[in-house]
């Protein structure tokens, strides 16, 4: 979920001021909009780091007491491979939500 939120925030942030003008956003509204997006990215990234840190700590404790080192390494390699494979489906899954969010912002700014 966190990776989806980060992807959406980055997707929106990557749009430049010309596209913002296309959506008829004023400069002040655009700056507020970008500030909120940046804050969202910081919060979600922080949350993600905490979760990753806790997961690493749990894995380390688990491996120390229950798993042989080689077994732990194999599990780690499988996990990192599955994370890389899941990036593309995650982006395909997130994209409609990003587009829906942009449409929502366009409707808000039309008034």
Curated annotation (Swiss-Prot):
Entry keyword set: Cytoplasm, Nucleus
- Primary location class: cytoplasm
The cellular location(s) given in this protein's UniProt record come to:
Cytoplasm; Nucleus
Under which name does UniProt file this protein? Putative uncharacterized protein C13G1.15c
Q: Which GO terms describe its cellular component?
A: cytosol; nucleus
């Amino acid at each position: 979920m966190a990776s989806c939120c980060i992807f959406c925030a980055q997707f929106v942030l990557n749009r430049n001021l010309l596209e913002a003008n296309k959506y008829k956003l004023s400069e002040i509204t655009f700056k507020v909009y970008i500030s909120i997006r940046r804050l969202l990215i910081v919060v979600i990234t922080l949350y993600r780091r905490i979760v990753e840190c806790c997961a690493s700590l749990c894995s380390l404790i688990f491996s120390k007491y229950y798993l042989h080192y080689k077994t732990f390494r194999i599990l780690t390699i499988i996990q990192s491979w599955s994370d890389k494979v899941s990036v593309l489906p995650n982006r395909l899954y997130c994209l409609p939500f990003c587009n829906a969010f942009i449409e929502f912002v366009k409707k808000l700014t039309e008034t």
